[in-house]
Amino acid sequence: MKKAATPVKKHKALGDWRGEMLARVRKIIKEAAPGVVEEVKWRKPSNAMRGVPVWSHAGIICTGETYKSVVKLTCAKGASLDDPSRLFNSSLEGNTRRAIDIHEGEKIDEKALKALIRGAVALNTSKRIRP
């Protein structure tokens, strides 16, 4: 049986910095949350049928989208997460989500991103536990 491609494989086929960045983000997420579930959702013509990589653990942690000039990492419950390093720089006005827009040439603060991912896992897990 052929092994299923990772969600990022199709995005790496972009052949540019966006695919490389998404692969880097994926590696950081997997290091921060080794039990994370990866899926591709929302395939449609507007994203060349690549879909959107989604990382979950007891609920969606974040999604990774590629646009023409940005890789967007959206945390489903980002508004509820502590962000002392101020990684969130997009979708700041809402009550639920927060996003990190990464432009070509920008570096990722791995330590801060891992802390956000671990915080998202803890939040998702705590919401599942009922007294």
Indicate where each model-derived feature is located:
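Charge-dense, helix-prone N-terminal extensions
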Residues: 1-131
